[in-house]
Amino acid sequence: MWLSDEFPRDLKTLRDRKPLVHHFMNFVVMNDAANVTLAIGASPIMAHAKEEVEELASKANALYINIGTLDEYWVESMIIAGKAASRNNVPILLDPVGAGATRYRTEVVKRILSETEVSVVKGNGGEMLALAGVTGGVKGVDSIVNATMDTAVKIAEEYGVTAVITGPWDYVSDGVRKVIVKNGTPLLQYVTGSGCMVGSVIASFMAINRDFVKASVEGLVAFEIAAEKAEAKSKAPGTFKQYLIDELFNLTGDDYVKMAKVEVVQ
């Protein structure tokens, strides 16, 4: 199994180091994102004030920019933080929430991509298709279409990033390497912000692993294995979310070896 040796080591490193992950997180999911970051072993900070984001982003081990809550103040803070992270070699994960739903959101995403050095872009099928120039795939912030590996490769090549497309299957590519993650459960679609939360876990692995394809796969598999284990304990979304956080906290390297469904595409 790909990463079966590396994942246990990286999970231990993550929990030993407790890296700082600076979040720009939307109001809807902020508490849950902080909790999953803590559960996997990293240290979250949710800070958005222009007066401090440059300092915090410079000191962080990873920066996660989630555009779910947008106004001009937040956008300027995101740009300030992104530039500071770029200057200090801090990896940036961008979640283009709702890209394609409005012109404003799409323009903000492209501005962040042009003015900062984003390492990973993670979104659902509709959002990522919008970045690839295909419209009509987003309703609100939800995807109404599926994207494919070809979309991930196109985005990776166009923007110089690792692209992560989440869905029933997850597609990860840096334009050269291509990986499909097949873990997960349909229950995740009934938990608001599950995609935002998986971004927190990916960013946590990015903080200790600068191979961003591997870090993205590690984060996806960790979150989705925890979701599968949570589903075994609850079939309803409220308690499922509670168990999801517990299972992230209890996750082991052996869980990856036993449960990961990862396909490297040749």
From Swiss-Prot:
InterPro entries: Hyethyz_kinase, Ribokinase-like
Cofactor(s) the record lists: Mg(2+)
This enzyme's EC code(s): 2.7.1.50
Organism in which the protein naturally occurs: Caldivirga maquilingensis (strain ATCC 700844 / DSM 13496 / JCM 10307 / IC-167)
Residues bound to ATP: 122, 166
Pathway where this protein functions: Cofactor biosynthesis; thiamine diphosphate biosynthesis; 4-methyl-5-(2-phosphoethyl)-thiazole from 5-(2-hydroxyethyl)-4-methylthiazole: step 1/1
Gene: thiM
Chain positions recorded as substrate binding sites: 46, 193
GO molecular function: ATP binding; hydroxyethylthiazole kinase activity; magnesium ion binding
Chain's role: Catalyzes the phosphorylation of the hydroxyl group of 4-methyl-5-beta-hydroxyethylthiazole (THZ).
Catalytic activity: 5-(2-hydroxyethyl)-4-methylthiazole + ATP = 4-methyl-5-(2-phosphooxyethyl)-thiazole + ADP + H(+)
Enzyme class of the recorded protein, top EC level: transferase
Transmembrane segments: none
Protein's GO biological process: thiamine biosynthetic process; thiamine diphosphate biosynthetic process
Keywords from the UniProt entry: ATP-binding, Kinase, Magnesium, Metal-binding, Nucleotide-binding, Thiamine biosynthesis, Transferase
Annotated Pfam families: HK (PF02110)
Family designation: Belongs to the Thz kinase family.
Name listed for the protein in its UniProt record: Hydroxyethylthiazole kinase
Range of residues in the leader sequence: none
